[in-house]
Amino acid sequence: MGVGGNFWDLLRPYAQQQGFDFLRNKRVAVDLSFWIVQHETAVKGFVLKPHLRLTFFRTINLFSKFGAYPVFVVDGTPSPLKSQARISRFFRSSGIDTCNLPVIKDGVSVERNKLFSEWVRECVELLELLGIPVLKANGEAEALCAQLNSQGFVDACITPDSDAFLFGAMCVIKDIKPNSREPFECYHMSHIESGLGLKRKHLIAISLLVGNDYDSGGVLGIGVDKALRIVREFSEDQVLERLQDIGNGLQPAVPGGIKSGDDGEEFRSEMKKRSPHCSRCGHLGSKRTHFKSSCEHCGCDSGCIKKPLGFRCECSFCSKDRDLREQKKTNDWWIKVCDKIALAPEFPNRKIIELYLSDGLMTGDGSSMSWGTPDTGMLVDLMVFKLHWDPSYVRKMLLPMLSTIYLREKARNNTGYALLCDQYEFHSIKCIKTRYGHQSFVIRWRKPKSTSGYSHSHSEPEESIVVLEEEEESVDPLDGLNEPQVQNDNGDCFLLTDECIGLVQSAFPDETEHFLHEKKLRESKKKNVSEEETATPRATTMGVQRSITDFYRSAKKAAAGQSIETGGSSKASAEKKRQATSTSSSNLTKSVRRRLLFG
């Protein structure tokens, strides 16, 4: 998908590794089709409707854990140009001879798979109930994602299609992994421009040469490396026009490259003017001359010095000789490349260029995007009907998203306190939790006995200590959520959720300051106690396991004492016995000793 020829490998050195907080408070455009297709093969048959489950969990993770404002984009009617490329790709992957490819009529688009379209419709229904904006593109979803990014409606795009850069994207994220400590790759167009010296039209030119979603073949015999060398010779304003000239059979004048006519005669005439060089040292002059009189370049009193491995003469002729050879090599390379491009039919395809440079990919104004509140009742009905989930499970899984909305509203205008079904209110900060290398507050949400008014307590629970919870990375292909914990304390019901530290601090600054102050006091007290224990170590401590010899008499000690007393006598007797045995054995014949030894 996207530009062919391992195009991502060309861009990977300029990727930035970003963590959880990079997307916080940022608007991101998501290619919904990518999420649906990504894990369909891996989990197909193991869970019911994996596309709905994945979209549900990933959206909540993106909204609550990453703190982003997602905008989902779905594909519209595909371009007729892509229909032929899709059929060709299917034939090659299936091992079918491409000579039997059906011909698509001009201007006719092949409709997408009906089952896949049904999956998209179900996911759109789910997202709308979650209050997430969904946009439909006039063509490709990655094209609309790129347009939203280039026009400033979103801050980044989440799509694996590398042709998002060709459509004008400024920041592209290939994929996110909520349940992993590994950072995700983020590509900025500004870094690509400074690193490779390529701009948007340069990338379009590379895609025309190596292949793309609309022309999977490209130019035969040209890969990413050759395409990069070609487009670097032209400016952004000229590169597409120069490719048009080459496709028409014209060979443009490239600096340091092609010259008109054949320069072979000039090169051979230069070779005839070659001055003699010593075969021993490589400098000007013959070997015989250097033996008669020393070489002035070697600096010897007599003769010359044998040239080292890889020696290069720097005289004017040799330098010019190397330049001419390099010029000839470059000329030959450019002639071959231009011939390959000229043989490609209808190169470059102007319709593909216009498609990449088009901005009319969206119906309406992107500024009308808005994020609403989830319709809990309808969501419960949908998930119970589609996935056969328990209603209480659906509400629990929605809690991280609802709590994030609550904290954002609280931080924005300091009003409103109902969290979920007007039942839970902010109670306290339990602890700091570290998971996958990311710190968050564990918040206790209380369901009061009376909901007539809002109140919160500064009192810290007994478990209000800093907890560092390092868990193994999840292998769940559907990026499932952790089910919120439920606690009962003195008749009150508490729900525990993980929340962003900065968001909680903005919503409840006093409670956060109180918690951090108490945490600091506990740490200083713990440090003082440890310093006192280090300064005055005790013989026995409650935290040190005692040896079993402190409770029972050791037989080894008594045996060791006896061995010290009898050590000398036993050694002497053993020595006498050994000498007697050796003496008696020496008097026996060899055959007798063998029978005694082996029986």
UniProtKB/Swiss-Prot annotation:
Family indicated by similarity: Belongs to the XPG/RAD2 endonuclease family. GEN subfamily.
Name this polypeptide is given: Flap endonuclease GEN-like 1
The UniProt record lists the keyword Magnesium: yes
Gene Ontology biological-process entries: DNA repair; UV protection
Biological role: Endonuclease which cleaves flap structures at the junction between single-stranded DNA and double-stranded DNA with a specific cleavage site in the 5' overhang strand exactly one nucleotide 3' of the branch point. Structure- and sequence-specific nuclease that resolves holliday junctions (HJs) by symmetrically oriented incisions in two opposing strands near the junction point, thus leading to ligatable products; HJs are physical links between homologous DNA molecules that arise as central intermediary structures during homologous recombination and repair in meiotic and somatic cells.
Chain positions covered by the region annotation XPG-I domain: 128-213
SMART domains: HhH2, XPGI, XPGN
Enzyme class: hydrolase
5'-3' exonuclease domain: region residues: 213-407
Record's compositionally biased regions (Polar residues): 563-572, 580-590
EC number: 3.1.-.-
Disulfide feature: none
Cofactor requirement: Mg(2+)
